[in-house]
């Protein structure tokens, strides 16, 4: 069975000082995917970073909240994490096992941190992974602008030699066909 992961799409990641590439487009595509997954009775899983007072994402604080533009339904699952890897010391793998999930479709923020780490972790745990090419975002970095970072990671993932399980990088429109 399949599941959609939506990683760290939280208010604290989308402040004016942390501008993300194509935020509204990314949100729209994630919402379209979420609706399609729900229609097909596949789980939609929000991964939410729990931070500390020293950084942002303190549970209960405004920065920690999922973006209100994302459509969330009562049956959606939310899993908290404290590290870049959504599997590290979380209930994600247990939840996926309970629901017989073998294929993950991954979206979210930030491409070069939590999204990348979670993709690689999922592969090492023998999940089939589909990265949504236009369903993840990041900010510009000191040596690369955000579109270059996103393009680089899409290229990297598409060219990886994963475990015996598959890794694909696919545009939203190709999933929604």
Q: Residue ranges of each PLM-predicted region?
A:
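Short, hydrophobic/glycine-enriched beta-strand segments
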Residues: 2-8
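Active-site-adjacent betaalpha module
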Residues: 3, 32-35, 57-177
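Short acidic, Gly/Ser-rich segments with clustered Asp/Glu that frequently serve as metal-coordination loops
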Residues: 12-16
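Phosphate-coordination/substrate-recognition cap region in phosphate-metabolizing enzymes
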Residues: 54
């Amino acid at each position: 069975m399949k599941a959609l992961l939506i990683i760290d799409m939280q208010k604290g990641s989308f402040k004016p000082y942390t501008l993300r590439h194509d935020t509204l487009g990314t949100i729209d595509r994630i919402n379209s995917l979420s609706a399609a997954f729900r229609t097909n009775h596949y789980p939609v899983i929000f991964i939410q970073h729990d931070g500390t007072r020293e950084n942002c994402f303190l549970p209960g604080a405004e920065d920690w909240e999922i973006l209100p533009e994302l459509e969330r339904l009562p049956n959606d699952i939310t899993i908290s994490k404290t590290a870049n890897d959504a599997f590290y010391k979380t209930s994600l793998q247990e939840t996926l096992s309970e629901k017989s999930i073998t294929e993950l479709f991954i979206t979210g923020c930030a491409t070069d941190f939590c999204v990348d780490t979670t993709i690689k972790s999922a592969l090492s745990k023998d999940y089939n992974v589909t990265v949504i090419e236009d369903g993840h975002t990041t900010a510009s970095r000191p040596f690369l602008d955000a579109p270059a970072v996103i393009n680089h990671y899409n290229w990297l993932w598409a060219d990886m030699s994963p475990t015996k399980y598959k890794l694909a990088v696919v545009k939203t429109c190709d999933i929604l066909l």
